[in-house]
A protein has these predicted regions:
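Acidic/histidine-rich catalytic cores of soluble enzymes
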Residues: 2, 31, 37, 71, ...
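Active-site acidic/histidine proton-transfer and metal-coordination neighborhood
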Residues: 18, 62-64, 77-178, 238, ...
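A short, acidic, amphipathic alpha-helical segment used as a generic capping/interface helix at domain edges
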Residues: 233-246
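Flexible loop residues that form catalytic
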Residues: 36, 76, 116, 182, ...
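A short, acidic, flexible beta-alpha connecting loop/helix-capping segment that sits on the rim
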Residues: 10, 254-269
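Active-site clefts of carbohydrate-active enzymes
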Residues: 216, 224-228, 250-261
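N-terminal pre-domain/capping segments
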Residues: 1-104, 136, 174, 201, ...
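Short acidic/polar active-site loop segments enriched in Thr and Asp
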Residues: 29, 67, 109, 204, ...
Length: 284
């Protein structure tokens, strides 16, 4: 397995070339870029990113020997794919098409998408129906691009068990519609290693973060808590890595983490995260 970092972790004032150089020098093997609103950061992809800009980023990636692993986004919200408003769903499709275009141009093997979500006054049934409709409308383009399109388990109340994800992925029925599994996002209420076992070969990409449960009764499940630095929470890494290996995953562990210590420089933080991922990989 290899070490990657999501670009949201990086100082927002850092441009593409400096970011790629810094992450390569601090020990990473890859980077995940993001499609964001214009102005989000100096290293965001946007709906307006041109072919020339993508060519330049590709050149930087090749020069620094730091590959683009995947393309995430902040623009799908928690529910846009399943929104009752058709305009919202059309925007979701535009975002996903942009992710596919960027992934293809930059050599990334996958993108991350967020289906569902259940805001007030919208049912689970409708959210799922509309999310699936949005995905199936894009299925021909996903398969033509040959880009793994991973649905992620986020905190939007949609995927509350691995079987929810399995049902959704299997209904889409495509070798390119898979799971982008976030190891830390289920720790508050479940056991992450067993999600990996259940999802199996559906997993295409992995996010890593850590979570500290708020109590100890019933194993600490449903006791609150908070996200913490890697290796400082309750993720059972000694079980997670063997579980990933057992389902055939040997890709990048992409950290989606944020610097909380204002006294620490960004480069020192990147080194700390890279070292933590290396420990996670080698300790199991």
């Amino acid at each position: 397995m290899k070490k990657a970092l999501n670009a949201w972790t990086v100082d927002s004032t850092t441009g593409f070339e400096e970011m790629f150089l810094q992450l390569k020098e601090t020990g990473f093997d890859g980077i995940e870029l993001n499609v964001d609103e214009v102005g989000h950061s100096q290293h965001s992809l946007t709906l307006e990113t041109s072919d020339a800009e993508l060519d330049n980023i590709k050149t930087i990636s090749e020069k620094t020997q730091l590959p683009v692993v995947s393309i995430s986004t902040s623009m799908l919200g928690g529910y846009r794919m399943g929104a009752p408003d058709e305009a919202d769903r059309e925007l979701a499709k535009k975002v996903i098409r942009t992710q596919l275009k960027c992934a293809k141009a930059l050599g990334a093997s996958g993108i991350l998408i967020v289906p569902g979500g259940v805001p007030q006054q919208k049912s689970f049934i409708k959210a799922r129906e509309l999310s699936m409709r949005t995905l199936l409308e894009l299925k021909p383009e996903i398969e033509e691009a040959k880009i793994n399109t991973g649905v992620e388990n986020v905190w939007n109340g949609f995927f509350m068990s691995p079987f929810d994800m399995i049902s959704f992925i299997d209904e889409a029925d495509s070798p390119y519609i898979r799971a982008y599994y976030d190891v830390g996002n289920v720790v508050a209420f479940s056991w992450t290693e067993y999600w990996i076992e259940a999802l199996g070969s559906r997993i295409s990409h992995i996010h890593v973060k850590d979570f500290k449960r708020g109590g100890t009764a019933f194993g600490g499940l449903n006791s609150g808590g908070s996200f913490v630095d890697l290796l400082k929470g309750d993720v059972n890494w000694e079980a997670v890595i063997p579980a990933l290996k057992s389902v055939g995953f040997d890709g990048y562990l992409t950290a989606e983490v944020f610097k909380n210590n204002e006294a620490m420089s960004y480069t020192d933080y990147y080194k700390e995260v890279a070292k933590a991922i290396e420990t996670i990989i080698t300790k199991a």
